[in-house]
Amino acid sequence: MSARATRPRSRRGRHPLPGELDPVAESSEEVDANNGRFETKPELHQEYLGPGLQSPRNWIKEGCDVGSHAVLSLSPEEQCEPEVEAHQVLQEAPLDSGPAEISVPSVYETLQCRLSSLEAVVAALRHHSLSFPKSVEAEDRDQGAPGPFGDEKEDAGPGQQEAARLIERNAWLRLALCNREDELACTQASLQDAQAEKETLQRQVQELEDSLMQMEASPPTPILRAGRRNSNSSTSGAERRPWVPQDSSMAHPFLQRLRSDSSTQSFGCLSTQHPAPETYLMEDQMGQLQGSIEKLKCFNRLLLAVLQGYKGRCESLSIKLAKREAEATALRLALQYSEDCEEVYEVLLALKMAGLGTGVGTTKGDLQAAEKEASRLLMKKEATMEVETPQPSSEGSGVDKPTPEELASQLHGYVQHLRERWALVKIPEELGPVTAPKATMPHAEATVQAILEIQPGPTLPHLEKSQIQQDLAATRDRLADLVLRLQLTQREKRGLELREAALRAQGPAHQLLLQQLRWERAHFAGDGSSGGSSEDPSSEEEAGEDRQQHYQGPLALLDGQMGKVWDSENVSQELSASLARAIDLRAQLQSLRQQLEQVTQKGRTRRVQSAELSRELCKAHSALALAFRGAHRKQEEQRLKLEQQVARLQAQQAEELAVLTATARALGKPGAPQPAQTFL
């Protein structure tokens, strides 16, 4: 091992805290060891170095005096001040603070100490790198070139060795300087991050101060009043300080960071030596804010847990909803196939009724209607079926129309096709009993209320599935009632429209009758006025005038009255015709109403019959489905049994084949001849 590796190493800057690694001290051990080596051997400095290279302090002074940066020279005391201050701070910290503060070091204090030590080391290394080459060149010039004599070689040997060692040390110091510059850049970056964090902390402190000012402006809370009453009863005067948590480990991390801030520590001694009532009030409010923050954190964690629970429930409900939607789709398809089968059965029933009772009570029109309905269903079948080839329509082709028997056979094929489609649909099983939800949410709500320290208020409304189903059923009932009312209103509207049409038809007839009555009244009024004027002898002038009017009137209106009489006869004929037409319309309206009632009654009976038929068909379909499933299950079991038998037979055949093969090989292979046998 080299002498440099065996020398003791010293630490600079500060003493490391227990359980903490000091990267600055570890990386600067070699430089400190070399500096210590030069300090322990002053005779080497004075013997082999020049007068300007006797100590590192002289190197620093010469570097500052001769350097090209024009930097003011610093005394050794000024250069060592950051390190001494760091040592004093670190030596005073364990005395003032307990083990809890040592276990949680201050980030800013550590950064300041490391930065000051790094600046001092970098300055020393720069001055060393500037002074070492000059001192070595001066020493070489003073000593001169080595002579051929042995005494000069012996005198110059130690100097050359020392110069080589110094050159090697200079190269090593340059490498260490590069490493330290990298470390300094990293430290500056971390310092910038720390400054940014410090700014954020200052903003948070400003926000806290604003909130504290708002709290001061607001009325005091009951907890603060109780704390003040307790503090007034227990202390007096300047000792009225509210209770704060003494354990530093239980304090909030934000408060610890505020306490460890270098900007706040610079005023720590003054605040502890001369406390003020505002400081106590601030600490009281900070304690309350800390409690509120912890309470809000607990509440936030609880809300997150409740949210996770609700999220899981929502996911499970979404899965169940997707399953129910698939089941509803399957049921819808099955219902559609059942309705199609119902229509086909109705058409088949109509065809059979028309075919059996052609001479009893049915007409040819019913048979034609049934055939048209069957043709429509067959066209629908051709449109919906994808695999089968479409059949040509009977209307556009020259082929004769199919007979009812052919239509019935085709409809039976359509029914078979619908049954096959219906069998492919997976019908869900019957729903089991609805399980009651777990009582986890009320417990969570009670915990939330306990954390918030509020009185238990009204519980949140819980909508269970049964209640939702009841509300949905009630809504459906109301909707059905509204639909029924709408239908009744529409029927009343149709009746009113029919009455309005009848009244509109009667309007011209009534107008003609009104005109005839007015004309007759005017005519009778004219006759009466003429008779009265002839009988009145009161005045001769009036009698003469009346006579003139009486005689001139008929003479003047004779031709017009004949036309009016002729017109009145036409009007009376038209009026009688309109009255007869109105009577006919009323009779037709009455007959139409009766027919409508009959049609509605028939529709109701048909609906009832179709409902019964659909129920029977559903039962038949369910029975067929069960039978089909049973047959399919039996067929599967038989197939499995046959496959097992085939496998066993194959295994037996393989074994027999192997035995036969071995026997054949044994028989075909010639054995060794016996003593009494020959090959012949």
Curated annotation (Swiss-Prot):
Disulfide bonds: none annotated. Interacts via its C-terminus with the first PDZ domain of USH1C. Belongs to the MCC family. This is Harmonin-binding protein USHBP1. Keywords: Coiled coil. Residues 179-218, 363-386, 467-506, 573-662 form a coiled coil. GO terms for molecular function: PDZ domain binding. InterPro entries: USBP1-like, USHBP1_PDZ-bd. Residues 1-51, 134-161, 220-247, 384-405, 524-549 are annotated as: Disordered. It comes from the Eukaryota. The keyword Coiled coil applies. Residues 1-15 have a biased composition (Basic residues).
